[in-house]
Amino acid sequence: MAATDLERFSNAEPEPRSLSLGGHVGFDSLPDQLVSKSVTQGFSFNILCVGETGIGKSTLMNTLFNTTFETEEASHHEECVRLRPQTYDLQESNVQLKLTIVDAVGFGDQINKDESYRPIVDYIDAQFESYLQEELKIRRSLFDYHDTRVHVCLYFITPTGHSLKSLDLVTMKKLDSKVNIIPIIAKADTISKSELHKFKIKIMGELVSNGVQIYQFPTDDEAVAEINAVMNAHLPFAVVGSTEEVKVGNKLVRARQYPWGVVQVENENHCDFVKLREMLIRVNMEDLREQTHSRHYELYRRCKLEEMGFQDSDGDSQPFSLQETYEAKRKEFLSELQRKEEEMRQMFVNKVKETELELKEKERELHEKFEHLKRVHQEEKRKVEEKRRELEEETNAFNRRKAAVEALQSQALHATLQQPLRKDKDKKK
């Protein structure tokens, strides 16, 4: 039998056979086991809030989870955009939720907004990288690992009633391949219903024309397909947030009180808050988590592994095992290491040669300087000797002249003394 036939048979997967059970086995409890394990482990959910300062991000979070999160008030004078994550442990019935709310503080407050999206992208990538590093550990513990990957980005749109700002389009375009984006119109009670309807159509048209991929509620699950399809048509959600309770009729409701009336947060005729809560928390929270892992994180992971040289197949679509990839990378690394060592050795040799040439040049310069100083010294010595000889000659000449002068002075003195004696002799005669 040919080798190709053997490979074909060895790689062929046998068709599974359907068998009937003679009695109860017990694996029908697997869903219950999974639920019990999940409840014991708890869940994590991470929300990124992007929007201008003062647009109502904190208020909406408080309204969504029916609690009050302790948050610092943001200033309008931030020099740059910074991400501020805060984690809370929540419990409803016997389900524990580790909720992380990440606020993009200072977004849209700078004069130069060209790079406003960069800190947000870097933060999302940093959470992906942290999870990837945990996965690549030899001794990893994903069960206990606190997953900080962003599961959903609530993008707060200013209710201008006209169109999206260029900053919004650029930012959402940069984020759509990294996170599930749900656009929402904040403070929807500031514009009329007719303006709001036109604004929604305008926003969706601009998102489509600019190729921005927002999160679509899944319709492949029959249990939620119908409601999700209906809710996809309501995007972006126009929301109003409030933690204040106002008495309407005989009951207290969360609402915003105005001189002209009351806007009820949970009244679907007033805003889309209930739709957002249903879609975000009660229906699609697990899908958002799954999409983050299977789509956005997998894209990041694949790109990172390809950068590291890992791939599933070669150019001929032949599958690579991890061992083959490791060996190929090891050979590549050793070859690169050898090349680097050779380059360093050659650089060292060249450096030694250059240093030797420099030392020889310095030695030659020093020798020339020494010879020059030696000649100067000899010339100075010759001049000194010549001066000394001239001085000795002048000294000898001076001494001779001095002796001659002294002799003349002695003779003159002697003659002067002899003259009076002669005169005395002449007088005596």
From Swiss-Prot:
Pfam families noted in UniProt? Septin (PF00735)
**Sites of Phosphoserine modification:** 10
* Alphabetical list of CDD domains matching this protein: CDC_Septin
Instruction: For the region Disordered, give the residue spans.
Output: 1-22, 376-398
Listed A to Z, the keywords are: Acetylation, Cell projection, Coiled coil, Cytoplasm, Cytoplasmic vesicle, Cytoskeleton, GTP-binding, Membrane, Nucleotide-binding, Phosphoprotein, Synapse
Composition bias, Basic and acidic residues: 1-16, 376-391
Can you tell me which residues bind GTP? 51-58, 106, 187-195, 241, 256
Annotated region G4 motif: where? 186-189
Region span, G3 motif: 103-106
Compartmental location: Cytoplasm; Cytoplasm, Cytoskeleton; Synapse; Cell projection, Axon
Q: Which GO terms describe its biological process?
A: regulation of intracellular protein transport; regulation of protein stability; regulation of SNARE complex assembly
Database matches in InterPro entries: G_SEPTIN_dom (IPR030379), P-loop_NTPase (IPR027417), Septin (IPR016491)
Q: Does the keyword Membrane apply?
A: yes
Record PANTHER family: SEPTIN
Quaternary state and interactors:
Septins polymerize into heterooligomeric protein complexes that form filaments, and can associate with cellular membranes, actin filaments and microtubules. GTPase activity is required for filament formation. Interacts with CDK14, SEPTIN4, SEPTIN5 and SEPTIN7. Interacts with VAMP2; the interaction inhibits interaction of VAMP2 with SYP. Interacts with STX1A.
**Name this protein carries in UniProt:** Septin-8
Native species of this protein?
Rhinolophus ferrumequinum (Greater horseshoe bat)
